[in-house]
């Protein structure tokens, strides 16, 4: 099995968790690769083979995001373009979407042996139009926030889904969410 590792190196424990993940993958004879830039940053501490993003994601069978929920969301935008499944490994204290905690790395054996199921999540493709100006955003796993920016008055928002008009809103902004994002938004409010 070929695995793309996408660690969030801004997280304090990400490098040590990445090192531990690599050791388990080696133990179970899995090949793992990093993005070129990441491999250059960590190559002095971890055996790291780097590939350009497109080659990495085309080559791999699965993507492992190491960090928190934000790391997984960021990695999901990359993985979806190549139709690759993604697994989150929590490198911090709290991650709702991580499939594995840092003290459960032995479960990587199940991944490598093919003993897993894939939970398909809805993602949003968003295009923002303002007059003749149009901007398509990356896919998003959680939600998209459209805000009025620095304007003082309310903005008119016309919301469509697959070309079908949903509604017009006059508001400061709007949050459009997937089921994953709405759950995260609700849980975050409790913390």
Which sequence ranges carry the predicted segments?
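ATP/NTP phosphate-donor binding region
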Residues: 1-62, 74, 102-119, 128-138
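A residue-level signal for conserved active-site and pocket-lining positions in enzyme catalytic cores
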Residues: 8, 64, 68, 90, ...
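Short glycine/serine/threonine-rich phosphate/pyrophosphate-binding segments
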Residues: 14, 70-76, 182-187
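Short, well-ordered beta-strand core segments
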Residues: 63, 86, 174-175
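Gly/Ser-rich helix-loop-strand patches that form or flank binding pockets
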Residues: 74, 79-96
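A glycine- and small-aliphatic-rich helix-loop capping segment at beta-alpha/alpha-beta transitions
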Residues: 79-84, 102-106, 189-191
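Catalytic core of DAGKc-family lipid kinases
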Residues: 93-172
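Class I SAM-dependent methyltransferase SAM-binding "motif I" and its flanking Rossmann-like core
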Residues: 115-117, 121-122, 174-177, 182-191
């Amino acid at each position: 099995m070929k695995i793309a590792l996408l660690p969030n190196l801004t997280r304090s424990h990400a490098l040590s968790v990445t090192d531990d993940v690599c050791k388990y993958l080696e133990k179970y004879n899995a090949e793992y690769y990093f993005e070129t830039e990441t491999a250059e940053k960590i190559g002095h501490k971890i055996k790291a083979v780097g590939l350009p993003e497109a080659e990495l994601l085309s080559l791999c069978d699965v993507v492992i995001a190491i960090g928190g929920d934000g790391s997984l969301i960021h990695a999901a935008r990359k993985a979806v373009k190549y139709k690759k499944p993604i697994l989150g490994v929590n490198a911090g204290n709290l991650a709702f979407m991580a499939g594995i905690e840092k003290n459960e790395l032995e479960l990587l054996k199940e991944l490598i042996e093919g003993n897993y199921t894939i939970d398909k999540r809805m993602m949003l493709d968003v295009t923002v139009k303002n007059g003749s100006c149009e901007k398509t955003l990356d896919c998003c796993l959680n939600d998209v926030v459209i805000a009025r920016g620095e304007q003082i008055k309310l903005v008119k928002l016309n919301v469509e889904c697959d070309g079908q008009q949903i509604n017009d809103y006059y508001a400061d902004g709007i949050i459009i969410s997937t089921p994953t994002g709405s759950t995260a938004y609700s849980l975050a409010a409790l913390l």
